[in-house]
Amino acid sequence: MDVKTYPVLEAAKNRTLLDNATYLEWYRESVADPEKFWGEHGKRIEWFEPYTKVKNTSFEGDVSIKWFEDGLTNVSYNCIDRHLKTHGEKTAIIWEGDNPYLDKKITYNELYDKVCRLANVLKEQGVKKGDRVTIYMPMIPEAAYAMLACARIGAIHSVVFGGFSPEALAGRIVDCESTFVITCDEGVRGGKPVALKENTDTAIDIAARQHVTVSKVLVVRRTGGKVGWAPGRDLWYHQETAAAEPHCPPEKMNAEDPLFILYTSGSTGKPKGVLHTTGGYLVYASMTHQYVFDYQDGDIYWCTADVGWVTGHSYIVYGPLANAATTLMFEGVPNFPDAGRFWEVVDKHKVNIFYTAPTAIRSLMGAGDDFVKRSSRSSLRLLGTVGEPINPEAWEWYYHVVGDERCPVVDTWWQTETGGILITPLPGATDLKPGSATRPFFGVQPQIVDSDGKVVDGAADGNLCITDSWPGQMRTVYGDHERFIQTYFSTYKGKYFTGDGCRRDEDGYYWITGRVDDVLNVSGHRLGTAEVESALVSHNLVSEAAVVGYPHPIKGQGIYCYVSLMAGEVGDDELRQALVKHVRSEIGPIATPDKIQFAPGLPKTRSGKIMRRILRKIAEDDFGSLGDTSTLADPGVVDDLIANRQNRA
């Protein structure tokens, strides 16, 4: 195919931190001598006791990943205290509310006060180093304070996206045996309240039935809405923090002490607790934030993600604050009050760097250029995209219409598991190709492997693996190291398998082609097909379900469900609606099925395995190339599925 290349813009070249020659030199060093390279760059954060060991990692056998392992530091100290002398009065967080008339600015001095008070409240309530604290919050500054307060005292935070259901929240509380929850009376999204405290109460009841008791709930008052209250367990955030001491010494943490657990979808139904540790994670998050976005002092930086996802952890909170940046937190949604909201916020706060997801770009593109054109966007210098591959059409629109052809687009590829960006352009160094994540970041060694496990060189297609560790890499699955090894290191021995398909072109640029396992990427968020299947099957009229992804114009991938009902039951639109509602309540709105096809039978092999390949093809309305169906126990089901498909072109 004919691929357009956009050379590095002169303006980007003139102010960049890294030009192409420097990128190539640093990259060569980082791969040839990672000890030396990261030994130098590890010093970008402050250490209470410096490290003497840099890298101690193995992708073989019991898989062990350690970086800077004898160093002592603290993430909260690095994100706040060390900036106070020179940047105390600088704005750390700009908060933009769901309501366009609501905003506030928090300086680094104020951030210190808020975080120390909250850290002292946690300590007074018995939270100790190593305890797990669940944070179930909307996009308000208190969510960032909560993360930083946990880091300050050595507690491990587990942030759960505010859009998840009580059942999903309970599962995450139980898995890490969390006894302390920080939440909010209600969230606000798109003008509507979100019942976070009510969901928390329900989740705590579910967790109690599984023998995990939450002893304290700290509640932020956001809307003043009426909420249930358990005296002795529930505490008001504003009352407790007002009475707390405004200073709290940071705990000295080993570089390999856990910082947070973040649950992500796997191909089996049970979400995995991805565990990130302290030193390597912060070095990598801050370094990628600085160089990928060409961040320089004074820039206003806005990542539109939610703190409930890894992008919010690394590129709203930890990366930017470690770099003394001004980071914008947005409570709202891109289309409220209308589809011009993002660009109004850019103008209002003079945003220089803007980082969002392809799904938002596609939906705003669909709303038309007028919403963009009524804003000036003259402050913008750099655009970024994250969460899923961006199709070239959306890339071009973003570059030409939003960026007025003067802002490089950094299309970043990474995962919850990687802690930070792995493959990305650098704005002053990399010629851009719409749809390509381009080249690896420092220390990252990608490899393309075919399905037989053979490494393929040059221009090639296959499965994306990484051959050596980098500091931001996850260390284990919380409480289940065996699952960590099985999921990531057993498919291709001695390599980290990303679960993504990938193409490398003749210039060595990488193009991510999407998941190759049973994981969907819906609006840039990962969702295991097994999770959606379990939710469907838990409905009393459903006997079996199979879920696959299909191309969706806005969300990237839509959710297509094949559902077999109990004997004697008949599928109709009313039942479809009921099943949609059921899945939403089991998992959350993010898992809303787009298509439900009632299927008397599913294509199975004689051993009973569902042939998802066939279901994917039918969902994609592409059944001319189904391949050999003779191995199916009942090949006749395929004709029925094709005849009743819900996705006709």
Curated annotation (Swiss-Prot):
GO terms for molecular function: acetate-CoA ligase activity; AMP binding; ATP binding; metal ion binding. It comes from Rhizobium meliloti (strain 1021) (Ensifer meliloti). The modification N6-acetyllysine is found at K609. Belongs to the ATP-dependent AMP-binding enzyme family. It comes from the Bacteria. It holds the Pfam family AMP-binding. Acetylated. Deacetylation by the SIR2-homolog deacetylase activates the enzyme. Mg(2+) binds at V537, H539, V542. Keywords: Acetylation, ATP-binding, Ligase, Magnesium, Metal-binding, Nucleotide-binding. The gene is acsA1. Its EC number is 6.2.1.1. It catalyses: acetate + ATP + CoA = acetyl-CoA + AMP + diphosphate. This is Acetyl-coenzyme A synthetase. GO terms for cellular component: cytosol. NCBIfam families: Ac_CoA_lig_AcsA, PRK00174.1. InterPro entries: Ac_CoA_lig, ACAS_N, AMP-bd_C, AMP-bd_C_sf, AMP-binding_CS, AMP-dep_synth/lig_dom, ANL_N_sf. Its cofactor is Mg(2+).
